[in-house]
Amino acid sequence: MTKVELAKLRTMIPEMRRVRRIHFIGIGGAGMGGIAEVLANEGYQVTGSDLARNAVTERLASLGAHIFVGHSAEHVSEASVVVVSTAIKQDNPELLAARELRIPVVRRAEMLAELMRFRHGIAIAGTHGKTTTTSLVASIYAEADRDPTFVIGGLLNSAGTNARLGSSRYLIAEADESDASFLHLQPMVSIVTNIEADHMETYGGDFSKLKATFIDFLHNLPFYGLAVVCVDDPVIRGMLPEIARPTITYGLSDDADVQVLDFVQTSNRSCFRVRRKDAGELAVTLNLPGIHNALNAAAAIAVATEDGIGDDAIICALAKFEGVGRRFQQYGEFETGRGKAMLVDDYGHHPSEVKVTINAARTGWPDKRLVMVFQPHRYTRTRDLYEDFSDVLSKVDVLVMLEVYAAGEEPIPGADGRALCRSIRSRGSLEPIFAATPDDVPAILADLIGEGDLVLTQGAGNVGALSRRLGEMKLSIDSMKSGA
């Protein structure tokens, strides 16, 4: 992209000409890093700090961002504005310094809202499926030569990044309900995939407040905007009479405006028909497993069809979709020394997400023994969904349970990995194996895996790094025993 094109894009946020340097506290997260990348490509000076370097910070550094390891008050001294992630605590030295220096402090969603303000925003919200649905929408728009800007909460494999600055008016982004900050967004189109109890501490434990917040999010649309919602979800179906915006529904239900029919999965690929209320039927091949991903594709199809994107671009984008990092990411099938075993990694950390991942594995590879390495994420979530976790985790063949990934929370008695193991064991169908740390897992797996196994690492914490390590070991029993 030329400097002239970049200068033109800068005029889309004219009042931000006063801004010279933007500092991100917690820049290594996918959501924060994505916004930082777009701003860096727009020509702003971007700095940021995090506790450690990772792939996100390395990419940003390659784009000219200055990355600090660790947090220090001096890092914000030259900043025009400071952006904070939800993970940053109030006693963070950079946050305290910014406030003392009267530097504006905004949340991630507020900065995303500024990027979206003068663009045609497409925002994807929901408890599950946001990242994949956002990726599918972005892929279709790219295939149709709409050249969108996108900000995704995971790595879009085909682009090699989770964010990109496009030259068109389109901005496609995830909308995060975890802290209700998605209410800052003013999109033209909003997708809501589903609504379940999660992040309830934000909503005072009141599910009706969570539902009301999603309705407020949809009512941030202009009166001529578009809400695209999954009618299969009972909460969304119940909310429909309260949504006072133009609405398109999608789902498996017969009354859906965009309906998924005749779903068939073979290994990693899914085939199905899509009946559209005001357009022709589509025969779709999706390069993703699981009927839940067919529904995610239906949402993307609904948006693209409404925006006049041709069927050829839709069909082509879905057929060649290369997936998203840590969303049923397949590392391959390896000769372990005791037969071949397959390694898959998935980010899902809510019982409903774990359930659909298990179903996708069972449907695509019905003859394989399912060996899951599960890492619970947050003590509050483990406590609030304890029975649901116990039920769904009982459905695998072999379970290795890690300790809860705290994500900054304090431990809660009775809501940890050992307690979950006891609960699952009491159901009588499975004998879980507890692993105190991820470093203990390779040796445990070396004694477990055999011919035809599907090893599935599951969770939102550092279990993803464990999966990469297992992939580097190629699930070799000798390598896992030695830790090499």
From Swiss-Prot:
ATP binds at residues 126-132. Disulfide bonds: none annotated. One of its GO terms (biological process) is cell wall organization. It comes from the Bacteria. One of its GO terms (molecular function) is ATP binding. It catalyses: UDP-N-acetyl-alpha-D-muramate + L-alanine + ATP = UDP-N-acetyl-alpha-D-muramoyl-L-alanine + ADP + phosphate + H(+). SUPFAM superfamilies: MurCD N-terminal domain, MurD-like peptide ligases, catalytic domain, MurD-like peptide ligases, peptide-binding domain. Pathway: Cell wall biogenesis; peptidoglycan biosynthesis. Signal peptide: none annotated. It is found in: Cytoplasm. Its main location: cytoplasm. It holds the Pfam family Mur_ligase_C. GO terms for cellular component: cytoplasm. Its EC number is 6.3.2.8. Keywords: ATP-binding, Cell cycle, Cell division, Cell shape, Cell wall biogenesis/degradation, Cytoplasm, Ligase, Nucleotide-binding, Peptidoglycan synthesis. Belongs to the MurCDEF family. Cell wall formation. HAMAP family: MurC. This is UDP-N-acetylmuramate--L-alanine ligase. It comes from Aeromonas salmonicida (strain A449). The lineage of its organism: Bacteria, Pseudomonadati, Pseudomonadota, Gammaproteobacteria, Aeromonadales.
